[in-house]
Amino acid sequence: MEIKSDGTYVDLTLGRAGHSLEILKKLINGRLICFDKDNEAIKESYKKLQKISPNFTLIQNDFRFLKAELEKLGINEVDGILADLGVSSPQIDDPTRGFSYSQEGPLDMRMNQQNSFSAKDIIDNFDESELTKILIKNADVKLANLVAKAIVAKRPIKSTSELVEIIKNALPAKIVREKNPAKAVFQALRIEVNDELGALTAMLADATQLLKKDGKILIITFHSKEDSIVKNFFQKQNYVDPRLNKLPINIQKIWKQKIIFPSEDEKLQNNRSRSAKLRVVKKLSI
C-alpha cells in the first residue's frame, strides 16, 4: 500500500500490530484506525503503537461494523483499507484459546472472548444435519457426514485433543494419512463461531463505499472460502450487462484487481504463509 503521510488508513485485523506499525511510521498528519475483536490484541498493540505516534485509534469490534464505527469518529472516506483474514498466530499458539488442533485445549475458538457462543456450544448442541452443513459450507470437509455422526455419538466432548481423535477415528485411514482431517474441521468450527464469512461480506460492502478514488483495499486470504467471497464480490462490482456493450458508450470498470502470492523465501520463513493470497483492489478514478 502506498501510504500518504496525511492519509486516513484502516487496519481491520490489528493482531499484534505488525502491519499497523509500518503504516503508522509513515503517517505525519494522517490517521490510522485499527479494528480487532480480541481484547488481548488491543492491549498488546496499544503498547507498541503509542511508542511510534499518537495518530491512531483502536476499536474493539468486529470489522463488519466498519462504516458505523468510522461514522462515530466523523470519518466518511479513507485512503486505504487492510485486512489480514483468519486467526492470528498468537491466537493459534495459545492452547487456552482452543484454535489449535495440535495442542490440548478447551473447545473455545472465540476471537472475541466477551461473546458467550463457543465451539463447545456447536459440538454439544448442533444435530448431525446442522454439523454436516457447517463442515461443508465453511471448509469442504471430506466425508463431513461421517465426522458429524461421530461427534454426535461421542459427545459431550471436553477438549480439542479428544475432538481430533474422534475426527481421525471417523474417517478412512487413507484420508487421515493424506492430510490431518482435523485442520478443515477446526476451520469450519472457528468460522461458524465467529461468523467470519458473514462479517467479510458485510465489511466488503462498507469498504467499497468508504474508499476514496485511487484508494486501495488489500485483503490477505488463507483459504478458498474467504478468497472466493472477495474475488466474486469485486467481479460483481465490475459486472456490465453484455447488452450495454452494443451501445455507443464507453463503459469503464470501477475496480482493478491483482493477486500477489508469497515468495519462496517468505514460505520458508513463515510456513503459515504458504496458503496466503494478497488481493489488491484499486478504486479507479473515472
UniProtKB/Swiss-Prot annotation:
Location of this chain's protein in the cell: Cytoplasm
Residues binding S-adenosyl-L-methionine: A17, G18, H19, D36, F63, D84, Q91
One GO BP annotation of this record: rRNA base methylation
EC number: 2.1.1.199
GO molecular function term, any single one: rRNA (cytosine-N4-)-methyltransferase activity
Reported function: Specifically methylates the N4 position of cytidine in position 1402 (C1402) of 16S rRNA.
Family statement: Belongs to the methyltransferase superfamily. RsmH family.
PANTHER family found in the cross-reference section: 12S RRNA N4-METHYLCYTIDINE METHYLTRANSFERASE (PTHR11265:SF0), S-ADENOSYL-METHYLTRANSFERASE MRAW (PTHR11265)
Protein name: Ribosomal RNA small subunit methyltransferase H
Reactions this protein catalyses: cytidine(1402) in 16S rRNA + S-adenosyl-L-methionine = N(4)-methylcytidine(1402) in 16S rRNA + S-adenosyl-L-homocysteine + H(+)
Native organism: Metamycoplasma arthritidis (strain 158L3-1) (Mycoplasma arthritidis)
GO cellular component: cytoplasm
SUPFAM superfamilies per the UniProt record, alphabetical: Putative methyltransferase TM0872, insert domain (SSF81799), S-adenosyl-L-methionine-dependent methyltransferases (SSF53335)
Keywords: Cytoplasm, Methyltransferase, rRNA processing, S-adenosyl-L-methionine, Transferase
EC category: transferase
